[in-house]
Each structure stands twice: as structure tokens, then as C-alpha cells.
Amino acid sequence: MGVKILGTSAENVDAAEDRELFDEILEKCQIPRPKGHTVFTAEEAKKAANELGYPVLVRPSYVLGGQGMRIAVSDEDVEEYIGVINQIAQEHPILVDKYLMGKEIEVDAVCDGEDILIPGIMEHIERAGIHSGDSISVYPARTISEKAKETIAEYTRRLARALHVV
């Protein structure tokens, strides 16, 4: 059609959503992350959860806004949540990650291909992982230390560069 689409390439958006590719990027960027597994069935999910130790975060891959994300504390929870996830994203894998108690932080960043501007680091009000897509956040973050904000900003810059975010 002759129309140039500006922005991050589809390949890099896919890399951000693909568990294995994103893990490779995090490794290259030296960014820590909780242990996790990619699974396809309830049995695999329960096995992964037991290996990681409860609680775990169970969520579909390739779903925006935290839809279908649940914190599981037992095999029964995993079984129930897999049923919900399969209704939302049947053709995609399921991610089972060790749940880390803490705060959920959201970062907005703008990049022109070279310079990266981080206008805000927001702090979610609810417990991490509960309502990621519809939660309330506050800016500026109220209880995040300056050191943590600096680390978050540095990790954001590393990821923006690695993913060629534009």
C-alpha cells in the first residue's frame, strides 16, 4: 500500500510476549525475574506450581491488561484457573510463575529510537497480580524508594533498547 507504519516492529512486540524470547532478552539485559514455566495443560500447570512452590501467578500468555491472571495457592486453584484461562486464550500457552509478595509498579516510557523518556513510575494500590488490567495506580509512586525507582528506570531503558522500542 506504500504506507510506512511507525513504531516498534511486530517481531519485537512478539518477543516481548513470547516467554522464551523475553527470558533471553532479560538475561542479556541482566534483569532478574521470578522463576516460571510455560505449560499447556492443567496437569503441567500443577506440576510447575508444585516445583516452584505456592503461591504462584497463573496467567495466559499474549493477553493484555492482566485478563485471566490469578494467584493460586493450591492445586485446586490451579485447576480452576486453567479452566478460566482456556476460555480466554485457548490457543496460547499458560504461564506459571513464582508469586513474589510485593508491590506492582507500572512504567510509562517514550522512545524515539535513541532517547528514552520515562515520564512516570506508578504504584498500583491493590496487591500485586490481583487486577492488573483494571487497577488503580498513583503517581508519583508513594512508597517506592529512590533507589528502587532508579533501578526500575534503568531496567526500563535496557528493555527499550533491547526491544528497539519506538
Q: Model-derived features: where do they sit?
A:
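N-terminal beta-alpha lobe that positions the nucleotide/phosphoryl donor
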Residues: 1-166
